[in-house]
Amino acid sequence: NIGTPVTLSVLRKGHAKALQFELLREDIQVESVETYDLSSSKQTVSYVRIKNFQIDTSRELKNKLGSLNMIDGVILDLRNNPGGLLEEAIRVSDLFLPGKKRIVSTKGTVVSSVHDAKQFFAAEHLLNIPLVLLINRGSASAAEIVAAALKQNERAIVIGEQSFGKGTVQTLWDLKDGSGLKLTIGEYLTPSGRSIHNIGVMPNLRLIPVTVPELKNGETELGRQEIFTTEKRFGLLS
């Protein structure tokens, strides 16, 4: 419960005795969207990383992009995004797609559904902005829904690796003993009607990952090199 203490025992390498730390439980809000300005003197390009799809991810993204006046291009990074809430994936896709464009459909053992763009946020300034989307083998589930929707509607150029390939709809049933039973009840289908399960989303342009040394701050030069190469390749920066 929030406000109650918890004691952690930490055994460090080279120490025979565990250290005790008392912490206070708190409700921690972690933002799922990060943005960076990659603009030149001529163009405004926004790099956006979505870590996962949680409550209000789409609104967070809309607000951050809306705070920039005149964006000339967006790089949407979904690498190592494990997924999350289906509704948020639909709304993120909706930000960049005009009304009635198919985003995803579900085919289930009991219930099936279709989800088309509805312009939830009426963000018309984002509909025609040049868009590059980055994926890799760690992009799964809801991240793949966004990638497939924007790729198959020819709204974004997808760059990177073939994605993970998790296209199942699951639900969790609570049992009387406090445990839970997770059941697969359907599958996601892309706008073209195809399943991505165990297949993934193929990028328009495949990049072969390489290992580079880490910098002191824990980041690598490769990330920024990939970003700027992407910008120049697709004309986001002149």
Predicted region positions:
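PDZ peptide-recognition modules
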Residues: 1, 5-24, 37
